[in-house]
């Protein structure tokens, strides 16, 4: 990136700054989150036309809602393999169903209450990241696993029990 910046400055190439192509951190503004504002919470996990979605999802955070969670450092190391199950997908209405999150932590319960915008953003990232990771794993399994040996079960979660405390 540094070399690119030097070359652009040296050649005096004009640029326009675009701030709406990518989303990454649900807690901050200034990203492409405005593209999601008109989508109802109950539909945030549904497929929308690509033209209405952020172009890039930067997977640099942990995403959570209810007990649904995805974090790249917590993802099992052999996730892309023949043996590993696929990630269990959250319900399509996850952003209208939950307003808080319980993060997976073996030592203590970490509970977070989320604001209205955060719920929609976390729901979007959670659904679409899990879908993308599963698609990558399925592609690997289809291409590299012997017939009948790949695990296509959607059963991998980060909590042993997916029930929220008020559901117990």
Task: Pin down the residues of each PLM region.
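Detector for methionine-enriched segments
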Residues: 1, 13, 53, 57, ...
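Catalytic core and acceptor-binding pocket of nucleotide-sugar-dependent glycosyltransferases
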Residues: 1-55
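Generic marker of "main functional regions" within proteins
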Residues: 18, 25-27, 67, 143, ...
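Polar low-complexity intrinsically disordered regions enriched in Ser/Thr and small residues
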Residues: 32-35, 69, 126, 151
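Polybasic, proline/glycine-rich intrinsically disordered low-complexity segments
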Residues: 34-92
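Juxtamembrane luminal stem/stalk of type II transmembrane Golgi/ER carbohydrate-processing enzymes
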Residues: 78-168
């Amino acid at each position: 990136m540094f070399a690119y910046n030097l070359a652009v400055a040296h050649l005096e190439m004009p640029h326009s700054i675009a701030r709406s192509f990518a989303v990454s951190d649900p807690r901050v503004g200034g990203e492409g989150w405005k593209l999601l504002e008109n989508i109802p919470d109950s539909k945030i996990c549904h497929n929308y036309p690509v033209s209405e979605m952020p172009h890039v999802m930067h997977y640099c955070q942990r995403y959570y809602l209810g007990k649904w969670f995805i974090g790249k450092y917590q993802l099992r190391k052999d996730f892309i393999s023949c043996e590993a199950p696929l990630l269990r997908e959250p319900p399509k209405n996850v952003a209208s169903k939950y307003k808080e999150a319980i993060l997976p932590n073996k030592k203590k319960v970490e509970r977070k209450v989320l604001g209205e915008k955060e719920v929609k953003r976390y729901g979007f990232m959670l659904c679409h990241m899990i879908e993308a990771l599963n698609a990558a794993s399925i592609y690997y399994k289809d291409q590299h696993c012997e017939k009948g040996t790949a695990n296509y079960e959607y059963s991998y979660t980060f909590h042993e029990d997916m029930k929220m405390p008020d559901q117990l």
